[in-house]
A protein has these predicted regions:
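Aromatic-rich peripheral "rim/lid" segments of glycoside hydrolase catalytic domains that contact
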Residues: 10-26, 36-141
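A cross-domain feature marking catalytic cores of carbohydrate-active enzymes
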Residues: 1-5, 31-36, 98-100
Length: 141
């Protein structure tokens, strides 16, 4: 399953249903390309067709100077809930992979609108773990 997620557009229960369905077929789920965009979703856009492109508008790039605590907290909660899901179904999951190492190199900064600033990974622009990483590690212990 490809994991380009958008905060507010993805439901953990849908992922749970997908994992269970795949497991019922006797195979293991494989998550690839995990990231979580916190930016507004233009035109209710979904998918990753590289030819898709929307015009830049400032209201679609509200976090250029930093992520507000409200959005950071919402993203943290999504990641925690997602990892709880992965742990609940670990026997049914073969692998989990990420799309990028840190926010500075994330494709989400330029897709589908070039020049936006997103915070889609678990590591900041300097490659340092975000606070949620410690919380995820505690879940796994």
């Amino acid at each position: 399953m490809q994991g380009h997620m958008i905060l507010g557009d993805n439901d953990i229960q849908e992922y749970e249903h997908s994992i269970s369905t795949i497991a019922s077929l006797g195979v293991k789920a494989f998550f690839s390309e995990l990231d979580l965009s916190v930016l507004p979703n233009p035109y209710n856009f979904s998918g990753a067709n590289i030819s898709d492109n929307f015009a830049y508008r400032a209201e679609l790039d509200p976090y250029k100077s930093g992520l507000p605590k409200r959005q950071e907290t919402a993203a943290e909660q999504f990641w925690i809930d997602f990892y709880k899901l992965l742990l609940r179904h670990q026997k049914d999951i073969l692998r989990v992979g990420f799309w990028c190492l840190h926010d500075g190199c994330s494709w989400r900064n330029d897709f589908p609108i070039h020049g936006r600033t997103d915070y889609a990974t678990l590591f900041d622009r300097q490659g340092q773990p975000k606070p949620v990483v410690k919380k995820i590690i505690q879940l796994v212990k």
